[in-house]
Each structure stands twice: as C-alpha cells, then as structure tokens.
Curated annotation (Swiss-Prot):
Job of this protein: Regulator of cell surface receptor signal transduction. Plays a central role in retinal vascularization by regulating norrin (NDP) signal transduction. Acts in concert with norrin (NDP) to promote FZD4 multimerization and subsequent activation of FZD4, leading to promote accumulation of beta-catenin (CTNNB1) and stimulate LEF/TCF-mediated transcriptional programs.
Transmembrane segments: 13-33, 60-80, 90-110, 225-245
Gene3D superfamilies: Tetraspanin
Subunit text: Component of a complex, at least composed of TSPAN12, FZD4 and norrin (NDP). Interacts (when palmitoylated) with ADAM10. Interacts with MMP14/MT1-MMP.
Lipid addition sites, S-palmitoyl cysteine: 9, 12, 83
Subcellular location: Cell membrane
PROSITE patterns for this protein: TM4_1 (PS00421)
Modification(s) after translation: Palmitoylated; required for interaction with ADAM10. The precise position of palmitoylated residues is unclear and occurs either on Cys-9, Cys-12 and/or Cys-83.
Residue intervals on the Cytoplasmic side: 1-12, 81-89, 246-305
Listed name of the protein: Tetraspanin-12
Amino acid sequence: MAREDSVKCLRCLLYALNLLFWLMSISVLAVSAWMRDYLNNVLTLTAETRVEEAVILTYFPVVHPVMIAVCCFLIIVGMLGYCGTVKRNLLLLAWYFGSLLVIFCVELACGVWTYEQEIMVPVQWSDMVTLKARMTNYGLPRYRWLTHAWNFFQREFKCCGVVYFTDWLEMTEMDWPPDSCCVREFPGCSKQAHQEDLSDLYQEGCGKKMYSFLRGTKQLQVLRFLGISIGVTQILAMILTITLLWALYYDRREPGTDQMMALKNDTTQHLPCHSVELLKPSLSRIFEHTSMANSFNTHFEMEEL
C-alpha cells in the first residue's frame, strides 16, 4: 500500500514537471521570436564589420539553432513522458529518461561553448566608430532596409548616432538628425529640437548601446535563466523517472515471485497432511482386521474349553 502511494506521488510530480517543460519551452520560443527583430536590425547595421561577428558569436549559437531545436524536441519528449506516466509503460519511461539525458548533455555543451565564445568576443569600443560609415546611406531609396534598421535601433535603445547625435550632421547631408532620435517622436520633431531645444533629442550615442547589447541584454538574460531552469528541471525529472521505473519494475516482478513462493510453501505444507489423510483409511482397516482376528481367537478358545 505504501509503495502504491509512492508511485502515485511520483506520477503526480512527473505530470507537474512535464507541464513545466511545456511552459518553459514555449516561453523560450516566444523570447527567441521577440529577439529576432533586434538581431536582424543589429546585423543590418553591423554588416561586414567585426561587430557583426561578435553579434553572431554571442547570440546565434544560443537563440537560433540550439535553443529552438531543444525546446521543440522537449515539447515532444514531454508528451512522451506524459503518456508513459499515464500508462505506466516502462519502455516509454525509459525512452523519456534517455531523451532527457541527451537533451541535458546538448544544453550543457552549448552553455560551455557559449561562455567560452563570450570571453573571446573580438570587439572593442574603437570598432563601434566604424559604424559611422553605414550612416551615409540613410534615407536613400534603395537602402530602405538600412533606414528602417537605424530607426528601429534608435527608438528601441533610446539613442542617436554612433557617438553623439551630431554624427548625423557630419556623416550625411542632413541638416538635423532623424525623427527617431526624438524623445517624443512626431513628424518634424528633430527639426524643432535642433532649432529650439537639443535636450529633446537622445543625448547618448548608439555605439555604447550596441556595445552593451553585445555584453548581454534583458532578453539574453531571460534566455539564460530559462535555460538553467530547464536544466535543473530535467535533472529532477530524470531522478523521478528512475525512481518510478524502479517502483513499477518491482511492482510487476514481485507478484509473480510471491505466487511462486506461496505455491512452494503450500506444497511443502500440504503434502504431509495429504499423506496422513491418505494413510488414515489403511490404518483404520488394519485396526478393524486386528480387532476381528482377536475376537475370533477369543471365541475359538472359549469353544475349546
């Protein structure tokens, strides 16, 4: 009875962990999709520079190929574990444990590799200044994608230019910065700010923001936290799965063993009784014959006398 209660408890815990796997995997996929626009625009601004290489080394090994594949596979594995737990199927639970172990090893290797790559990111502050060369094509009809990337980055990171907002005046033929540099953006806001109050423009350059972006953003920190949480949850799930496999295996093994032992005990205990019962009629018959012989001899002796 105690073992049956333990099995129920283990199954409930595995149900909860599988649900947690699904939720965290969906969260990782959502955050990865959320970061996609950031990465695309940053790569557009940093094309053919050392900054582009740093962005790729920092984000893409984690965000695109590995984390997305692991999370998609983990959703399927969670379904496998759920079915195995419901049906108490040893084979499905064994596959579930093996899949979790493989996923955990991949995540661990990816984490170590990413950490080493972050240490080796070959970018310096001086590399950010080279981004000024990308500003000359801003606003041109055939470079709309670059214009969109600059506007997106300046709005999202609340910055203007590379070092300072005056970079737009130096590197382009513009008389004032783009409207995306305004703290409160509206059509013509940058012209008004340039003529009246420069404090209405973002004072910090985008070079520092991009440098901070390479060192880690909130989205990347969320991904790391989710990755660590998934790893810890996988360890707990593997421990519970091994325990459940052990309990189910011995629950299936012990009834057969008990029946064999009971049959053996019954055989050893009941055979003497059957033998005694079989011997009882023979003994009674011998006693009757002996009694009849004794009475006959007594009667014969009395007649002789």
